[in-house]
Regions:
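A short, charged, Gly/Pro-tolerant segment at domain boundaries
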Residues: 270-287
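Alpha/beta enzyme core
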Residues: 3-242, 248-251, 255-256
Length: 287
């Protein structure tokens, strides 16, 4: 399979069904988010059943900040390259859909599907006017409905993971956030979302309430110090993402190694790198 070979519709539909089934397994679907073809291939080789992108990592890798500073065209091009590099399903972080109108979201979804992805993360944040702010439930539900219609027209059972930033953006008073999240989740699922992503919360009490109150698979985002995959599994979490954490770790290593060689003239930071033959071998079959 060449990195220039497009994914056929039949293959894409099969991967979409596989990806959907991964949300109903005995263990949560764990997604160590990637940001370019190389990281995606490494994640696949490590044993990931699917590859998810991180918008922050993608943006940084292309020289842009997070928050829809990247154009739709650049984002879709990157997704196509990731899809062509791996053999597992790919789900794309499309932020808020790259545009203010529901028609913009539909256009982005069509582009992502043309690139071969089988899932999207679509958030209710708005990055316009210096944001981010959180859109109204009604407005974002309409955007999700537009995404669903676009996917249905293509004929791919796209997995729409509706992200709500109520906790991440500290919307309202703390005591109101659970109900606000549950109300948004219900509206988003009714509009066509297949799963709900609630970043910014990992405590067991809230996570358990979210699992019980949302009629769709729950996705949480983890960071150092968060509960383990097994602990989340015991509470019914269906999907676990790491967001930009791996990209951040890689860039931290880059800075540490650069500072070491530039200041002390030593190279100990390089010691745990993957070997040239191993890395090169990951991509030889794509030639």
């Amino acid at each position: 399979m060449s990195n220039e070979t497009p994914t056929t519709l039949a293959t894409q539909i099969e991967r979409a069904r596989t990806f959907r089934d991964l949300h109903a397994g005995e263990r949560p679907l764990v997604l160590p988010n990637a940001w370019d073809p190389a990281s995606a291939r490494v994640v696949e080789e490590a044993g990931a059943a699917a590859v998810a992108t991180t918008s922050a990592g993608v943006g940084w890798g292309l020289g842009f900040g997070d928050g829809e500073r990247l154009s739709r065209e650049r984002a879709v091009e990157l997704i196509a390259r990731v899809v062509a590099t791996v053999d597992v399903p790919v789900t794309a972080d499309i932020e808020a859909g790259y545009g203010e109108g529901a028609e913009d979201v539909a256009a982005t979804v069509r582009g992502v599907l043309a690139a071969g992805a089988v899932g999207v993360n679509l958030e209710d944040a708005s990055h316009a006017a210096g944001g981010p702010t959180v859109r109204s439930t009604e407005e974002n539900a309409a955007r999700i409905a537009a995404a669903r219609q676009a996917a249905d027209e293509v004929g791919v059972p796209l997995f729409i993971n509706a992200r709500t930033d109520v906790y991440l953006a500290s919307v309202g008073e703390p005591e109101t956030r659970l109900n606000e999240t549950l109300e948004r989740a219900a509206a988003y699922v009714a509009a066509g979302a297949d799963g709900v992503f609630v970043p910014g919360v990992v405590d067991f009490e809230t996570v358990t309430a979210l699992v019980k109150g949302i009629e769709a698979p729950l996705n949480v985002m983890v960071w150092p110090g968060a509960p383990s995959v097994e602990e989340f599994a015991e509470r019914g979490v269906a999907r676990i993402s790491v967001g930009a954490a791996i990209a951040q770790s890689v860039h931290a290593l880059t800075r540490r190694a650069a500072r070491e060689v530039l200041t002390s003239g030593t190279y100990t930071s390089f010691a745990e790198g993957l070997s040239y033959p191993e890395l090169n071998g990951l991509f030889e079959r794509r030639a």
